[in-house]
């Protein structure tokens, strides 16, 4: 074990951290267990992350944030929960939830189980559930995609807003013949 650890350089650990977002000690351990093979270390971290995610699955995720995305005549809203408010304010977690919202905009899934089983838009080799497990491993808390909804309005527009620092989100469907975005304020 000592010889393996010596072969792992700080530069290798840094590179693996940048590739995966995993913690320093996890990256060091992965490289040591795979004789410094970067590809095998990534796979080791992925498998280890799934195991960590499974261990955290029983913990209550009662905090979290709501994100919305509006593109043209279509919109989506998602709620993703975390265990602590601290994580809910984390920039990486927020970016992940934005990705989940983008996924929800294009999904054909009727419920959460179908949503989790579909191919992840950001990496088609993974499912949404795989991406979630990866985030759980990186962030170190149980996370849960609690719910999502889509809205489509062909004869008007959709607006969105977020209340209370991401705790409450709203999609508003406005049916109107006003098509110019600059004129929409007069409608609402």
Can you annotate each of these PLM segments?
Residues 1-4:
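Short, Lys/Arg-enriched N-terminal segments with co-localized hydrophobic residues
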Residues 6-188:
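N-terminal assembly/interaction segments in proteins that build large macromolecular machines
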């Amino acid at each position: 074990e000592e010889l393996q650890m010596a072969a792992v350089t700080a530069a290798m650990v840094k590179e693996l951290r940048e590739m995966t977002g995993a913690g320093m000690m996890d990256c060091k351990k992965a490289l040591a267990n795979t004789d410094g093979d970067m590809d095998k270390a990534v796979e080791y971290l992925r498998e280890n992350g799934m195991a960590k995610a499974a261990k955290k699955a029983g913990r209550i995720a009662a905090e979290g944030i709501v994100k919305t995305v509006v593109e043209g005549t279509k919109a989506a809203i998602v709620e993703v929960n975390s265990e602590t408010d601290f994580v809910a304010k984390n920039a990486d977690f927020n970016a992940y939830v934005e990705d989940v919202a983008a996924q929800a905009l294009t999904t054909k899934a009727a419920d959460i189980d179908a949503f989790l089983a579909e191919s992840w838009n950001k990496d088609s080799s993974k499912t949404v559930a795989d991406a979630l497990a990866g985030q759980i491993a990186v962030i170190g808390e149980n996370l849960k995609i609690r719910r999502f909804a889509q809205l489509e309005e062909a004869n008007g527009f959709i607006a969105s807003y977020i209340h209370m620092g991401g705790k409450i989100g709203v999609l508003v469907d406005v049916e109107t013949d006003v098509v110019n975005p600059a004129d929409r304020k007069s409608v609402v």
